[in-house]
Amino acid sequence: MGAQLELIPHQEVVAPTVKPVSLQDRIDLAVDGIQGLIRSGRRLLIATSFGKDSSVMLALVIMAIRSLAERGHRVPTVHVMHADTGLHENPVVQAYAHRQIDAVRDFADAQNLPLKVWVASPGISNQYLVNMIGGRTVATVGGMDRKCQQSLKAAPLGKLRRAIAAELRQGMGLSYSPQKVVTLIATRRDESVARGAAMAARGESSMEPVNLEADSGGDYWVYSPLAEWGTMDVFSFIADVTNGRRRTYSDFAELTEVYRDAGGDCMVNLHLRGEGERRAACGQR
């Protein structure tokens, strides 16, 4: 008798359920990551333009250090950096940023938080518009914004980082190391395909800091706590603060107004039309 075939009952393959990541999950992960850096002895520099992404990042940093302090952890000074681009900046945006700087300082004083705000400005001889008028550079058009960005933002912030490093070196003595200094930046992968690709190429993530100057033997460590955040996560966080569900250095009402005034619409509608993510290197962020 030939071998009999055993019939195997059909089993339906059920795909595993993937739980969506909630806003609170993203907040908890970001706060845990920031606290982990502090507990490991890293000194934090926070780069902020007071645009939507960097404002949310700064609020997360404040949440992290407040929580640590409440649990009895010693939190070293966190250095907040802002680039005032001077003549080029929209006066409304510039005035808004100055008020945000005052708000951060007032909140830190009231809450006894170890925050120190530094403001970088391009020297008058390096002002982009002064150089253009004086014939030392030419106006950038289209995508030719690297010289503008370098003059007004990157170079002054680089000088500021060196000044902060010198202060840390003096205060920490022999325990100081360039590897201990980490700059938090508010880059997100979903800002654009190009931004996501650039972040991947540099190794930026919300998991651990990356040294952007490793190839040249330098030490410029950056950490991106918002790397995996979507634009709607950012908007939802801002809405929570504006509606009083979360408290930080600002109620973000003026931040919302700046975006609304810029486009005549609410931030969410700007995003849906694709206008909320358009940024020039020397423009509003």
Which residue stretches match the model-derived regions?
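Nucleotide-activated chemistry modules centered on ATP-dependent adenylation/adenylyltransferase
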Residues: 1-46, 52-285
